């Protein structure tokens, strides 16, 4: 008998219960998340008196960040509070995990405190999957980045940003530039872009920072910025993931900028209305020139703003789905 594979993110009815990866999500499901996010964007308007909705009132959201984060943790906290949830940010360095308690012991103890949702960032690929397998049926898990594997909410907010400025995915050329080998954002973006029907996704970077198998994912590989940026609609820049590198993969930051930094001159090779994105944190003068980061074609701060609405959408959707 053939064993049927079940996506661990989905309920028996195919609804989103956890968000662990963009891989395995349908185009309709991704579009539903983006459409839901658009309903929350107006909550960020500075002239709006009330910025909360009661969708998660009475629910407890635990942010478990085993790696440092500023944007992601903060936007998840804002998103949960705007949904009226009670939010607890666990200080990992001061917690029992730093004293030898296992990951699952930590989860079990927090679950005993009536947790309804865990937002998890962990250095080990697959950690959110492990947690999702062991939580109670009513508890939801959102992956806020696991090792090199995935960063699904970043991928979704990137898709929201692209859709906001470009409308139609099916006639775009998108270039992802930099340290793709170590980037969970790149993996999530590639899965999302190909699922949404983007006809050409390009990866640009030195051979030492590009993983094998990109072509099998439908990605065109370039080792030259000048060649890879020609005629693109969207440029997604990635930082060097020095904390995940072992050994000297590059000569120096200066040499990297010389070969792969996004300058105004290189950006001019893209379409005149191309947009520039970056998941942050940026290393100015390494992968991106300040003139580009702060320029008219940059939508980097828009990504941060849209990230709140996208994370609200994800939390609201998963909270409504149980087996």
Curated annotation (Swiss-Prot):
Pathway: Pyrimidine metabolism; UMP biosynthesis via de novo pathway; (S)-dihydroorotate from bicarbonate: step 2/3
Reaction(s) this enzyme catalyzes, per UniProt: carbamoyl phosphate + L-aspartate = N-carbamoyl-L-aspartate + phosphate + H(+)
Transmembrane segments: none
EC class name: transferase
Pfam families in the cross-refs: OTCace, OTCace_N
MF term (GO), any: aspartate carbamoyltransferase activity
EC number: 2.1.3.2
Sites where the protein binds L-aspartate: 99, 184, 239
Subunit annotation: Heterododecamer (2C3:3R2) of six catalytic PyrB chains organized as two trimers (C3), and six regulatory PyrI chains organized as three dimers (R2).
Annotated NCBIfam families: asp_carb_tr, PRK00856.1
Job of this protein: Catalyzes the condensation of carbamoyl phosphate and aspartate to form carbamoyl aspartate and inorganic phosphate, the committed step in the de novo pyrimidine nucleotide biosynthesis pathway.
The protein, known as: Aspartate carbamoyltransferase catalytic subunit
Organism whose genome encodes this protein: Cupriavidus taiwanensis (strain DSM 17343 / BCRC 17206 / CCUG 44338 / CIP 107171 / LMG 19424 / R1)
Name of the gene: pyrB
């Amino acid at each position: 008998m053939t064993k049927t594979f079940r996506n661990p993110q989905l309920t028996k009815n195919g609804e989103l219960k956890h968000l662990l990866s963009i891989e395995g999500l349908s185009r309709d499901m991704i579009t539903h998340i983006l459409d839901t996010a658009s309903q929350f964007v107006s909550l960020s308007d500075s002239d709006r008196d009330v910025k909360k909705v009661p969708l998660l009132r009475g629910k407890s959201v635990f942010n478990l960040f085993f790696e440092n984060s500023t944007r992601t943790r903060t936007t998840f906290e804002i998103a949960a509070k705007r949904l009226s949830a009670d939010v607890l940010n666990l200080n990992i360095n001061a917690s029992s995990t730093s004293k030898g308690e296992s990951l699952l012991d930590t989860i079990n103890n927090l679950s005993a405190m009536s947790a309804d949702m865990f937002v998890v960032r962990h250095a080990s690929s697959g950690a959110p999957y492990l947690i999702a397998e062991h939580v109670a049926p009513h508890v939801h898990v959102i992956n806020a980045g696991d090792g090199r594997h995935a960063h699904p909410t970043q991928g979704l907010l990137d898709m929201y940003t692209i859709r906001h400025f470009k409308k139609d995915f099916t006639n775009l050329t998108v270039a992802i530039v930099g340290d793709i080998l170590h980037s969970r954002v790149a993996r999530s973006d590639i899965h999302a872009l190909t699922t949404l029907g983007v006809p050409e996704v390009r990866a640009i970077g030195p051979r030492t920072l590009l993983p094998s198998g990109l072509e099998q994912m439908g990605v065109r590989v370039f080792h030259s910025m000048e060649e890879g940026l020609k005629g693109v609609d969207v440029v997604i820049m990635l930082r060097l993931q020095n904390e995940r590198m072992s050994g000297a993969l590059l000569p120096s930051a200066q040499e990297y900028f010389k070969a792969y930094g996004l300058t105004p001159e290189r950006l001019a090779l893209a379409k005149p209305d191309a947009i520039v994105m970056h998941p942050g944190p940026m290393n100015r003068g390494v992968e991106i020139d300040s003139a580009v980061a702060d320029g008219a074609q940059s939508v980097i701060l828009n990504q941060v703003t849209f990230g709140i609405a996208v994370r609200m959408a994800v939390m609201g959707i998963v909270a409504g789905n149980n087996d």
